[in-house]
Amino acid sequence: RGLGDVYKRQDQKVRQRVGQVQRDMVLREQLHVLQHELGEDGDDELYEYEERIGRCRASDEVREKLMKELHRLSKQPFGSAEGAVIRNYLDVCLDVPWGVETHDRADVEQARKILDRDHYGLEKVKERILEFIAVRQLNPQAKGKILCLVGPPGVGKTSIALSVAKAMHRKLSRLSLGGVRDEADIRGHRKTYIGAMPGRIIDAVIRSGSMNPLLVLDEIDKLASDMRGDPASALLEVLDSEQNHAFRDHFLEVPVDLSRVMFITTANTLDTIPRPLLDRMEVIELSSYTDEEKLQIAKRHLLPKQLKEHGLKKTQLRITDDAIRRVIAAYTKESGVRVLERQLGKLCRKAAMQLVEGDVKRVDVTESNLKELLGTERYSAVSYTHLRAHETELHLV
């Protein structure tokens, strides 16, 4: 009798399990029909992911990882939180431009033309950049040092990096490091965290759409560190040519080859850049502009740009050289030309108002009517550059 009870209990358990399995199968089939009616067929989604993974030009290790995640996704019930995490992970991984590269055009003469067209002066800086490009032309596989452009705000550090990207025919992506305190901003957050995303480096590569872009790391001297980690240490791995061929972002969890990426960093000062980071970079210093250089930059670059942005033609606004000199001396006090560009933009807006409201067909800006347009002079009309030179002479005496 005891043995019969055991068989009976086992038979009941088997029947219960079979019933549960059959119930689950029926529910899954009903869910599948509902998803199909709603246009949310999970099989179509899985097939699409599988096709994208098949077309992906990533390494076998990466594709194997993606297929594992896809298999996990197939086991998730519709609408589950974990399913959403896996979908986000697959989407980000497949957005990485695996195997996509642009062909370098390391032509020194073309680079010289672009640098001369986009920037006035800065001869020593241009020469060093051309040397850098010449080495790339002779040896495309050369692991040159990272360039670090150092100088006051507004002297053209970032715009020079843009010109280098044009000259080398590389995609460009910029990221600002100012105020970055968390190491996860560089390495990314693990995908299990809510709202997790890859770090800024991988994000910049994705935005560029190429595995060999030129990445401009702005304000590298503004990096900070706190209890959440040291982002400068994470950057060491990114910039080190011996390590960055297998950079691991915490979100992606697979190696990414950054060895083909060209990095240019910018900074206002070297004092706050950690020494290990500085040792991996070659510093190119950009000095302040003289008043005459500012005048030429305004005429060749800033004014044409502002005219275009404000919808004005060259024939509708004329600014004399003396007026620009007065703007430089009395309305700006800077090493670069950012404030000068803003003041020229203000003159363009004033001109636009006069052209729209009045009967004038051209606005002439001279030294005599400058106050009417820009208001009271902010600084002494003595040249700021000359004033600094005079102070230096007094100090030497």
Regions found by a protein language model. Name each.
Residues 221-255:
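Conserved catalytic/switch belt of AAA+ P-loop NTPases
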Residues 2-10, 385-394:
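Conserved small/polar residues in nucleotide/adenosyl-binding loops
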Residues 338, 343-388:
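C-terminal engagement/docking regions of AAA+ P-loop ATPases
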Residues 147-175:
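Walker A/P-loop
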Residues 208-212, 248-266:
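AAA+/SF3 P-loop NTPase mechanochemical coupling elements
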Residues 1, 5-135:
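Extended, charged alpha-helical coiled-coil/arm scaffolds that mediate oligomerization and mechanical coupling
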Residues 169-194:
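AAA+/P-loop NTPase substrate/partner-engagement loops
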Residues 58-59, 270-279, 287-334, 338-339, ...:
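Conserved C-terminal "switch" segment of AAA+ ATPases
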